[in-house]
Amino acid sequence: MSWLRTSPLRQSLTRNSGSSGSGNSSATTTLRQRPIDAATDCDPRACYDSFCKHWQQAHEIIQHPGPPTHDDVLGVVSHLDYMVTLLLVELHHCNKVSLPTADSAPPAAPCLEYLLSENLLDKLYEWASTTGRYANAVRLEQLKLYELLVSHSRHQLLCHEPFLRPLLKILASSQGEIFPPDLEKRLVILLNQLCVVLMQNVHLLDLFFFSAQTQVQEQIQNGSLAAPKSGTTTNFIIFSLLIPYVHREGSLGHQARDALLLCMALSQKNSNIGHYIAQYSSICPLLVTGLGGLYSRLPNSIEISSIDWHRITPDDVTEIPELTLFMNALEFCNAVVQVAHEMIKQQLLDFMYQGFIVPVLGPAILQTNIDSQISAMSYLDLILRSITEPGLMRAFVKFLLDTEKFDGERILDALVERLHSPDANLCMVTMALFDTLLGLHCEDLMLELLLKYLLPGKHVPISHRHKINKIDPYLNTTEFFLDLTPDVMKRARDLARPKSVQDQVDPAAATAPLAVMLPSLPSPVMSKTIGANWNYYGHYTGDSLYANVQAYLFEAHSRIAQCQRDCAKWANSYRYQKWPRQGQARANAHALELAKQFFSEFASAAPMAAAGTSDLGEKQLDSLQSIGESSGYESFKWRPADEDAEGIDVTTTTATSDTDLEHNNSSSIGSGRRDSWRISHSTRNELLLTDLDFSEDLFAQGTVSLGPFLNAIWSKLQTFTSNSLYVNLHLTGLITRLAWYPLPLIHSLLLRSDIAITSDTPSFHQVLRMLKQQIDAELPVAENSLEIIDVARSYLIDREFRLVNARKITDNAPMHQQHQQQQLQHTTNPTQQQQAQQRSTYATLSAATPVQASPTSAYDPFRRSDNKRRSISKSISSMFSRRSTSSTAATNTNTASSGLSQIYAFFTGAASTLVGGNNGEVSARGAAQEQSRGNTCETSLSTAPRQEAQTAVVSSSNSSIGGSTQTLSATHSSSTLHGVESGLQTGSFNSEPVSLDSVASMGIIANTSGTERSRDLALCAVLLDEWLKELAAIALEQSVVLVTEQLL
């Protein structure tokens, strides 16, 4: 209650206290001179006498005839201030307010009892209504008094008419009024306290319902608080007073929204509240229109200051005031949907869809300008990651799939088209948005993106469909993925193993082609950074997740389990089933007759059918079985003769029924071949050809499409070696998220190398083979290649540590340094404001600079050109400190690449500037890494976008090597828009900051071996190697999940 000591009227009234005729007692004078606490010594009798005397003097002023003068108002306010102080002292010494009864002992709170018995509050209100221009000053003191009494007495006083009646009067008179800020603050605080009390005492809700204004005045004057007559419009006075402050900024808006949420929660307990809010209040349209207005104030173009920026993070929200206000309003709408009555919830969802989502978000996303598209999709991604209520989420999903609101064009289709964009920033933002959409585990979205193209099974040849639900091939898929590792990465893995491990290699492995080809290749000089702190290919000794297969398995298990729990709530299982339900037998009888007639005509028309020999009949059967895959990419693949004769179970596909029908029309087929496909005579007549569409399945397999979404992903994957590093990180993360779904139909595309895919584009496994062949051809196993591979590997690991440390330093920054940064942001100098907004730990990218992670930049994580040594703390500060935009822009005009040349020079010592004066830098880097070992969060190398809560291995605050940092809650954050704020800057150390992934030149560009193309391929090889390990881990975990399902 700081207002007791810093009241705006206390100082002005001090001079007039003697002339006002107030005789102050010694106890009151003592109380005014020191703070009030529980240990304050006071005489209860003296306090009571002083309280009564102050009221008598105030009452004398109130009884003066004529309008109140300035001195009269000051005198009453002064006496009222003293009375509040005495009441506060009394209530501090009362553990509980106990109102007197007829046979009770003397009251424990005599001042409070006198206040109620003499109707002081009512008399004070009546006099305040006549003060004219001084009404706000008197009202402010009244609100302070009510706030004090409500906060200390809770609900006890609300039950008594001498307190409730003037409270209702002052609240009713506040409707429709415009008050100064200090009065608004006191009013909202009082309303918030009343909501808290009502939430704990629901039976008091009826005390705050009023009828029309005229009827309210009549009830108050008559002293009756009876319920209003039927048919009159009710008014929840507390809720009505809070509505104008719902979109206010600062603490006032927060308190008003908190109080409104309590009212919404009360609607669940009292249906009258819910009916009133839904039918008679304007809260729902006010929320939606305010949300649309706040969205229109958002920046139409986001300044991208980082090469790997792809989404808005919580740090960005706090740095952009307009975005902060919008997110506050959105989170409030989400909370209302969560706690409000069903009528309020449904009304708000309808207004949200018709008043904000469709008319505001729709046109924003469909803009043609690339910068506007990036910003609109980033805002949509942030919205989807922020809302948690299923009802609100369904509204956004409906928006993405709606075909009627935008001239027949779906928003989802427009987003898929942007995956083909050559602009790297737009492509990364789009993939980040789809990563969020896939992370929702929404059945409708998955059906539109993938499942409706896969459910017919036409992407799988007829002879392979019985393999879809089998489990054993998943283990072979693991070996398949590991075999796709580029040869140069296999050689690098062998060289990274300890010598004792290399000596124990199986002699039979010497006959392998790679072992024969590389017996005389000299071992290159590996990176100087290989040590106990980093792990390589199974030897996990550090904090990096590089090559940590155990971490991949653990993460895959957690992600698959979460996805399985969410998908278990779907309306359909989306399992490929050969046998239809029994209820569909009669409905499909006509289709069966047409199928039999087709086979009969096909057999009679064939020239070889007349021969009647068993050999020709068997050959005809084989040719019919191969029709489904004759025009695809697997048409020339050799198949064993008994491949189609594997055991059949209830999950086999239409290959069984097709062969059974062919058996009915070919009496010359051998008995052995015939019996292997026979089910039984009793069930053969019930077989239905549910999956065989003769017009499309038999003759048009080569034109089967997997859908625009998968086609866009596959086309992006085919250009893997020419994409930027960050696009590839998001691409691999998106495909990995698809592989987490426990759906065999999706596994047939991603995790089943034994299933041939017949489509109009190369299959996923064929693309992986092509990537391996391309890397092996352009990056042969040689000493130079291995050196570049080591540089690329070291660059990615070092980048992982730098991102994690940057996030950690931001989280651990001292509060006073954050306060200094806030002061810089609120400075009045326009030049300083511009510099404060433009400073970032990320280097500013020129708009004309291609976003390509090529190893030709002069990036150096520590300044190597300085002659003097620096301490460890200064080196860390230099790494994460800020730099002016002008210097960054100047350097960007000289170089723009990924930075592997400087990293390579740093690790191998090839640059001429490293020959001296660098011991201090090396030790600083080693110490900085050693400092980060204990607390460095583990991250995933190959999967950049992450959104769910992390497991014990993958921490929730981690940042992936793709540049996305994990969120601290259920939603996920990524690298910040304006960079990571460093808390290590000091006034005496003015070093230029270094970007985490800077493309700016920061010294002499080191000469490295190999071309730019080879260095790009090295990055792709390292990333592909890690991604294949992750896919292998997912295949293993999916097999365990499927086995568990069958056992259960």
UniProtKB/Swiss-Prot annotation:
Keywords: Phosphoprotein
Residues with PTM Phosphoserine: S500
Compositionally biased residues, Polar residues: 1-15, 839-857, 929-954
Key word Phosphoprotein present: yes
Biased composition (Low complexity): 16-26, 816-838, 955-978
Pfam families: DUF5917, KELAA, RAI16-like
Annotated region (Disordered), positions in chain: 1-32, 652-675, 813-871, 924-984
InterPro entries xrefs: FHIP, FHIP_C, FHIP_KELAA_motif
Family: Belongs to the FHIP family.
Name the UniProt record assigns to this protein: FHIP family protein GJ17503
Organism: Drosophila virilis
